[in-house]
Amino acid sequence: MESGAVGVGAESATIHADGFEAAADWSDLLTPETYVGYDRAENVASYNEATFDTPHEYARPSRLSLNEWSLFGEWTVMGEAAELNRSGGGVVYRFHARDVHLVMGTAASGATSVPFRVRIDGEPPGAAHGVDVDEQGLGAVTERRLYQLIRQTTPIADRDFEIEFLDPRVQVFSFTFG
């Protein structure tokens, strides 16, 4: 205790963290943090033919290896982020982790809310939905921040994640996993 403190108990406090504040499940975390912008992007299946800093149509790959990801739809890929130019585009990711988080925000060019739908192995997440998504996989980007999209229960396995944006003018920055 600090010298001179009076009336301070020695008991410890229990802190319960929810959502993205909960500690990562390190024993089942096999997928690393991933940046979407070309300055730091790794394991991306769709950038080999990309034209950076201009609109480009990306095809959805038929299959991804573990920790590989891809854009689909028309995006402008910039150094730190990618911005969706037309509705119906999204990101697919083959991952192995309990939680999927994505840092994203509305683009400066006017959108105030961008609705999205997430799927895991092609289906709505159901009970595996994160705090920013309902059981049907629906959510909305309203500001630039980290969104918790998936929170699975055990057993954790390699899974296919997809986020599809129902309107354009969203920016995606990075994935984190827990």
Task: Cite the ranges covered by each PLM segment.
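Non-globular targeting/processing and membrane-anchoring segments
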Residues: 1-178
